[in-house]
Curated annotation (Swiss-Prot):
Designated name of the protein: Glutamyl-tRNA(Gln) amidotransferase subunit C-3, mitochondrial
One MF annotation (Gene Ontology) recorded for this entry: ATP binding
Any Gene Ontology CC annotation: mitochondrion
Subunit structure: Subunit of the heterotrimeric GatCAB amidotransferase (AdT) complex, composed of A, B and C subunits.
Source species of the chain: Culex quinquefasciatus (Southern house mosquito)
GO BP: glutaminyl-tRNAGln biosynthesis via transamidation; mitochondrial translation; regulation of translational fidelity
Classification of source organism: Eukaryota, Metazoa, Ecdysozoa, Arthropoda, Hexapoda
């Protein structure tokens, strides 16, 4: 009965079902057991001093107050290579800006001093993990699994590439 206000606790012998009916029939203000309607206030969330910790606009922050890194231009050849490797179409100007912003954000990590910091292999480094012995087994279900695929080639699943349609129109 922890967390249920005292005045809502059932007397001995009452069932959980009757308790649920009692709670369902009470008003939300009565559930707290401390506030009444005269002291209850409506909160305007737009007038709070700190309404949200999440910024409403992008924040060009820096690490340790250093100047913002210079913008790294991405040439067309690099964009084409990234498109080919990632199978994602970066042809629009917005995608190009997003890529440059991501590179600028990630380049901030270069200014972090990591001398004397040991690499973290796992967050559970100090925990003893019991692992089972690895046994190689194909399970003899390859054909059953491949029957789930719409398209297979050389006993492999065929999936559409990224956000590029399979039937692509030639570029102008």
């Amino acid at each position: 009965m922890i967390g249920i206000p005292f005045h809502l606790r059932p007397p001995p012998g009452r069932t959980l079902h009757s308790l649920v009916r009692t709670i369902a029939s009470t008003k939300p203000a009565d559930l707290s057991g401390t506030q009444d309607k005269s002291t209850r206030q409506k909160i305007n969330f737009h007038e709070l001093k700190h309404p949200s910790k999440v910024p409403q606009r992008p924040n060009k922050s820096t690490i340790d107050g250093q100047s913002t890194p210079t913008r790294i231009p991405v040439d067309t050849q690099t964009v084409q290579l990234l498109e080919r490797l990632s199978l994602v179409d970066l042809d629009s100007a917005e995608a190009h800006r997003t890529l440059e912003d991501a590179i600028e954000f990630a380049s901030q990590i270069l200014s972090v001093d990591t001398d004397g910091v040991e690499p973290l292999n796992t967050v559970l480094e100090r925990e003893r993990l019991t692992l089972r012995e690895d046994r190689v087994s194909d399970g003899k279900i390859q054909q059953d699994v491949l029957r789930n695929a719409c398209v297979t080639e050389e006993e492999n699943f065929v999936a559409p590439p990224g956000n590029i349609p399979l039937e692509q129109e030639p570029r102008k």
